[in-house]
């Protein structure tokens, strides 16, 4: 008996171990499955949660739910059945909480998933900016994100001796040159090309009538090209083929261009004339007329071609003077650069001849019209008397004044200027106002003032 006792004990031990094993297996087989989270990751806009469940669980079904972080779990929430031990959640820029539950209503909050987030895209309102020295621009940065993303922006200038940038993204031009300003958010970045140039000046609140007249041949082709780029950028920013685009062209030439354009009585024009002349007291083309490379645009000549600031014979004054713009030459230049095609025409009120006063709603100007609120920045003005003869454009307005851009021939305001006129007596100088809504169609990003 003693000899077989060890074998009996061994057999009983094995039976006990087997019984414990199957007892454990049986107990785990029928008790609720509790998942063990193995991996949580975010790819693009999908949060993926992987989990494991003990091998012997009979009921391994699990269900997934996302809820806004501000919301509580409700009885009528719709849970999605997990597949292959994985839950996938599509998210957006809201903050969510994520949950798993089994068939026994045991709910587990997946805390790691709630703190995932990334930046999906960065965009700016302008990818290239042009600044005068000491000029500033604050870009509008749009951040697209999903989940719990850190939207802290780090601004960097590649050359802070040319242009600096502060923590709020305000860019300041310091000296001539080109550089990039970069906005970094998490793992994404976007760059803005910055051109700083002394070819333009800061726009003063009041027109500087003391600035020098443009001289002949002071600009290179590259200068002219860059100024044309800046002009186009200014117009596109507020809206090409809009009221604002036309106003911006006038503001640029009078305020941002550093020289005053002289008045030059036209030697002729291309519209409504048998004897056609192009670019002599006018320039019915996009861009500025500063370099001889622009001669290729000129279709007809009388005494030219000569760029603005260069002298040639004036057939009206019977003397040589610097080329520039007469009143209708200025207004047609403004219109064509703003995106419109009125034709290279004049300013009078002439039956049977197309004039600038034929555009828009020609209205006799008086105090009633002023008080009606119908007059807007961008409307044209005609003087003197019912026969016309002079044309101008309103480029600014405040409570008391209209600010009028025009090319004048009388001292002390000879050339392209902006002058303030009281709303109480402006109509004493201008007989007609052309209300231009029907012509422009759209206002664009119109502002009453330029500052």
Predicted regions and their residues:
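N-terminal capping segments
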Residues: 203-328, 332-338
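Low-complexity, Gly/Ser/Thr/Pro-rich intrinsically disordered linker/tail segments
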Residues: 419-451
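Extracytoplasmic soluble-region selector
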Residues: 116-202
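...with weaker cross-activation on analogous glycine-rich loops/strands in unrelated enzymes
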Residues: 340-414
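N-terminal Sec-pathway targeting helices
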Residues: 1-13
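Beta-strand-rich modules
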Residues: 95-106
């Amino acid at each position: 008996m003693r000899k077989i006792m060890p074998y009996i004990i061994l057999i009983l031990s094995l039976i006990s171990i087997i019984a414990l094993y199957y007892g454990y297996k049986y107990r785990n087989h029928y008790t609720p499955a509790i998942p063990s989270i193995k991996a949580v990751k975010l790819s693009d806009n999908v949060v993926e949660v992987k989990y494991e469940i003990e091998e012997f669980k009979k009921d391994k079904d699990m269900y997934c739910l996302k809820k806004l972080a501000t919301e509580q779990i409700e009885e009528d929430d719709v849970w999605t059945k997990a597949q292959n031990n994985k839950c996938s959640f599509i998210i957006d820029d809201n903050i969510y909480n994520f949950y798993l539950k089994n068939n026994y209503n045991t709910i587990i909050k997946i805390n790691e998933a709630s703190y995932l987030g990334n930046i999906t895209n960065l965009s700016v309102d302008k990818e290239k900016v042009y600044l005068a020295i000491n000029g500033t621009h604050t870009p509008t940065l749009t951040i697209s994100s999903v989940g719990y993303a850190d939207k802290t922006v780090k601004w960097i200038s590649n050359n802070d001796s040319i242009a600096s940038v502060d923590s709020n993204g305000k860019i300041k031009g310091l000296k001539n040159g080109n550089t990039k300003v970069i906005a970094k958010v998490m793992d994404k970045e976007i760059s803005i090309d910055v051109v700083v140039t002394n070819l333009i000046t800061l726009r003063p609140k009041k027109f500087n009538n003391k600035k020098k007249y443009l001289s002949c041949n002071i600009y290179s082709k590259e200068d002219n090209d860059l100024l044309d780029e800046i002009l186009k950028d200014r117009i596109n920013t507020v809206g090409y083929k809009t009221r604002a685009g036309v106003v911006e062209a006038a503001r640029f030439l009078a305020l941002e261009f550093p020289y005053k354009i002289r008045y030059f009585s036209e030697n002729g024009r291309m519209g409504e004339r048998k004897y056609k002349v192009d670019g002599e007291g006018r320039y019915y083309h996009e861009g500025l007329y500063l370099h001889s490379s622009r001669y290729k645009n000129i279709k007809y000549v009388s005494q030219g071609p000569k760029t603005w600031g260069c002298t040639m014979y004036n057939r009206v004054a019977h003397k040589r003077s610097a080329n520039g713009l007469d009143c209708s030459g200025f207004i047609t230049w403004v219109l064509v650069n703003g995106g419109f095609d009125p034709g290279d025409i004049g300013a009078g009120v002439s039956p049977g001849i197309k004039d600038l006063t034929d555009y828009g709603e020609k209205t006799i100007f008086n105090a009633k019209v002023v008080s009606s609120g119908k007059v807007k920045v961008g409307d044209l003005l005609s003087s003197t008397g019912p026969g016309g003869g002079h044309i101008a454009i309103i480029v600014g307005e405040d409570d008391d004044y209209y600010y009028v851009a025009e090319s004048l021939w009388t001292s002390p305001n000879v050339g392209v200027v902006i002058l303030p006129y009281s709303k109480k007596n402006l109509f004493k100088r201008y007989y007609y106002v052309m209300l231009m809504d029907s012509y422009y169609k759209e206002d664009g990003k119109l502002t009453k003032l330029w500052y």
